[in-house]
A protein has these predicted regions:
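Conserved ABC ATPase "signature" region
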Residues: 117, 121, 128-146
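Catalytic Walker B motif of ABC-type/P-loop ATPase nucleotide-binding domains
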Residues: 175-179, 184
Length: 330
């Protein structure tokens, strides 16, 4: 989506090209305030290539960040550069962005092919070029077989894929997806995750927001964590988890004989507590999650235990936020 041109000013008339070696997205001390409310506070980050998960609870600032990147909002302070260019001085970089908004605004009476073709025409393609491009992007998201059916007959997951397809008609180098998995069934989630991963493998810079940790984990380990408008973490999710190894964790194990399994697990030096919440469940308390998980498979097999599930109930986004904020998550 293009910004309000009256706010941006006149586009530069000279030919534009991305700055070589510049980050695709660069924010320097960016803040956005509404009166006394700080939606984002002094965010600095640089992103280029591959998939990055933008994590945060509701109200963390994810949508505000995306609206700033898309030019729908202007920073209260700080600077934003896309492909090395300040888009508020020259809006040309917006032509290289594809945006998938959280909310649906599609015409249910249109076919997916007609809807996507329309956006291709709006990007300057001829009628024939738009048809070819619509075929290409709908095939990429796996909707070729139903491309000429009305969108109103689509499931939630199919509608989400139409939104992704329409964001790809300009062959963007930066793709921004706001909560693309929300409301989708498991099969649709897997399909959309595969599409997002494929875009990352193609070298595109992909930003995907979510408030659900395991969704992002299935797509990428490169994350940005926002909380109350502030940047809490930027980097590899695995590295953040390693830093959390010295704090208490719970492992929940569904099994046929919890007490027999407990006799073997309690010998692990990293285990400091055992409990039996149900007749088919064992809960293990540990200060070293990785060590226990490393030993569990061989311990289970060698001793003939029948295990149905292994889960970490406290290994979620809220736990990471508690760790990063010292337990002061509000």
């Amino acid at each position: 989506m293009m910004p309000d041109m009256q706010q941006v000013g006149q586009a530069q008339t000279q030919q534009w090209a991305p700055e070589i070696n510049a980050p695709v997205v660069l924010l320097e001390n960016v803040s956005k305030t509404y009166g006394k409310i700080h939606a984002l506070s002094e965010i600095t980050l640089a992103l280029s290539g591959g998939v990055t998960g933008i994590l945060g609870m509701n109200g963390a600032g994810k949508s505000t960040l995306f609206n700033l990147l898309m030019g729908k909002l202007k920073p209260s302070s700080g600077s934003i550069k896309l492909f090395g260019t300040d888009p508020w001085k020259n809006p040309a970089p917006y032509a290289k962005i594809g945006f998938v908004p959280e909310h649906e605004k599609m015409h249910d009476w249109m076919t997916a092919h007609g809807f996507v073709s329309l956006f291709a025409r709006l990007n300057g393609l001829t009628r024939d070029e738009a048809r070819v491009e619509a075929d290409r992007v709908l095939d990429f998201v796996g909707l070729t077989d139903v491309a000429h059916k009305q969108i109103g007959r689509y499931s939630k997951g199919m509608r989400q894929r139409v939104k992704i397809a329409h964001a790809l008609v300009n062959d963007p180098d930066l793709i921004v997806l706001d909560e693309p998995l929300q409301g989708c069934d498991p099969l649709a989630r897997t399909t959309i995750m595969n599409v997002i991963r494929e875009l990352g493998k193609m070298g595109r810079t992909v930003l995907v927001s979510s408030h659900i940790l395991h969704e992002i984990e299935r797509i990428t380990e490169q994350i940005v964590i926002l909380h109350n408008g502030r940047l809490l973490a930027l980097g590899n999710l695995h590295a953040i988890r390693e830093k959390m190894d010295n704090i208490p964790h719970t492992i929940s194990i569904g099994c046929e004989n919890p007490k027999e399994l407990a006799k073997d697990i309690i010998n692990n030096n990293a285990v400091y507590g055992i409990s039996f919440p149900r007749s088919d469940n064992l809960q293990v308390q540990t200060h070293n999650l990785n060590e226990v998980h490393r030993e569990l498979p061989s311990l289970i097999v060698e001793n003939g235990h029948i295990v149905n599930s292994i889960d970490n109930p406290d290994d979620d986004l809220e736990s990471i936020l508690n760790y990063l904020t010292g337990g002061f998550v509000s």
